[in-house]
Amino acid sequence: MEEKTYLKWYNKVGYGTGDIAGNVVYAFLSSFVMIYLTNTVGLNSGIVGTLIAVSKLFDGVTDIFFGTMIDHTKSKMGKARPWMFYGFFGCAITLFGVFAIPTSLGKTAQYAWFFIAYTLLNAVFYTANNIAYAALTSLVTKNSKERVQMGSFRFMFSFGTNLVIQSVTVGAVEMFGGGATAWRTIAFIYCIIGIITNTLAVFSVKELSDEELKDDSVAGEEDDKLSFKQIIKLLFSNKYFSMICVIYILQQLRASMVNVGIFFMTYVLLNKNLFGVFSWANNIPLIIALAITPTLVSKMKGMYKLNKYSYMLATVCRLMVAVAGYLGSVPLMLIFTVLTSLGEGPWQGDMSAVIAQCSEHTYLKSGKRIDGSMFSCTSLGVKLGGGIGIALSGWMLDISGYINLDNAVQPDSCINMMYFMYLWLPFIFDIIITVILSFLNVESANMKLKENMQNQ
């Protein structure tokens, strides 16, 4: 029997625009905050890395806290949409703050300014906004195909925004005259774009009522009666939740190393404009793969095999990027970057649907629905993995003797470190992700649970 549909095409597209907002924050921050802080503000990369690492201590708590708050929320807008809507205004203010550090302040005050703005952005406002956004996948439809389509639209906008930001930001900063004022202007423009697109996404969908979301075959405790301790226990008793958390963290660590490309292109390939070219090679294939992911899921009768085998392809191709890098062949690096991205695309497209299946797994086993808390893995992974990745890149550059000047000649130790960070670490992370995906067959587990219930 055909599943009931809940969404029109414009609901899915409108929902997807929310990741334009998410990426004017995340892509801008992860790609350019380190080079802005070191080369424009003049801060030490090692100290910046340490501050980011300390900031991450808050994230694990706030992720699950906001997930729980979403589960307990009851309003005319629903559970998640209020948090998504109001949370982004805080994102905009604090993102601007990160890229508007006054040059007149002393170094200690500049470090403090950055730490406060960065922590509020990540641990509070981005957390509330992003968990709510991800949770909408479970709250606006019960149709598994529509959930995959929502994920595909979302990440098409995500990678499209990532592509634009990585391609135009360096040139835009130069166009506005360079220096602190230019970075502040660019940040302001991105904040306005984010507010507009986030608002569009919030009002493009409507959450289903609690009655509509219930499965009559499952009886259990109401989610708003669960304690914080009970929710934590439910989350980590679901092995698939833990797997997805680890994958998300590894993906963001990998993305942080790929974003070291701005340093690799500047000091190894001696052409910083290549960063935009590689961004195209990375993001355009992802967008293409996302567009066909719903069809591939249908043809392969599920997400598990598609995710496993496509990521195997991505891992092999990323190894070839490293080989091409040591050969000094930019064309070969670009070709294998394209193939890597094509392999990564299906998982990016159906990731939200897999998390929704993960949430369904907890519901089928316990009778307790904790969608908001379950989707905390998305924000936790993005912020913890991304933050540690940026911190790690700062530490590794500092240890290798990085000189924070645009036209500096970097020592051999630093050049070798850039090779390791940009070429080898992404490959290592891809291997681990592929292994975890080979065990992430939550669809099959849910089918067995439903069959057992029907036979009882």
Regions found by a protein language model. Give the residues of each.
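Membrane-embedded alpha-helical bundles of multi-pass transporters/translocases
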Residues: 2-456
